[in-house]
Amino acid sequence: MTARHPEAHLSHRSGWLRAAVLGANDGIVSVAAIIVGVAAAGSSRSAILTAGIAGLVAGAASMAAGEYVSVSSQADAERADLSLERRELTEDPAGERKELAAIYRSRGLSAALADQVADELSAGDVLSAHARDELGMTELSHARPFQAAGASAASFTVGAALPLLAVIVSPANTRIELTVAATVVALALTGYMGARLGGAPPGKGTLRVVIWGVAAMALTMVVGRLVGTNV
């Protein structure tokens, strides 16, 4: 008899993975675009690095704050829903038991089996049963603000460090070209890794990330050259 291999599910990664991939891509694109724009204006290496580091610090702080506020709002909504459900279970347990049975009937169970399942779950941790089956809340989907904020800030910093490193090691006459090349490679890698970790086809996701990153750098390069010419 062939041993059955456990399936590798990816849904438990959804919260931190989304924040980490978004943070890394944003760090790469944001700081690379700043660097290319400032370099296109004819600025010195020192000025370019100063602008890039400032963008890294500001971006990491902004990503962390944004994720924390967003996920905290989600957590507040979850707590409010659970509080409401807890009150309804106290005030009308029979009605909530019927509601639970109706949910199971809508999923294909017979009326008798749905009633039996609702009775057994209601005899145990009934709030968890309603949270899972009525509200769609599970431990895997539970909002974690600090985890999301930390993942965003850390990944933004790592992503932003790549174009900064390209500026440090590249000569002045090829600084823009090497920064763009390093950024494209980094975006391709993060796009590919994000797609693979998320269980999605990597080709389309990688191409989408690279195209938008190149577009952002092209725009800031044009602006940088215009400003450098006219100022």
Model-derived features with residue positions:
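The feature identifies polytopic integral membrane transport proteins across all domains of life
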Residues: 12-23, 45-53, 113, 144-150, ...
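Interfacial loop-to-transmembrane junctions
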Residues: 189-214
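Internal alpha-helical transmembrane segments
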Residues: 1-70
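Small-residue-rich segments of transmembrane alpha-helices in multi-pass membrane proteins
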Residues: 159, 208-221
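Cytosol/matrix-facing amphipathic helices and coiled-coil assembly/linker segments
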Residues: 1-19, 71-153
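Structural signature of hydrophobic alpha-helical transmembrane segments
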Residues: 173-185
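Juxtamembrane boundary at the C-terminal end of a transmembrane helix
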Residues: 221-231
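Core segments of transmembrane alpha-helices
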Residues: 27-32, 152-162
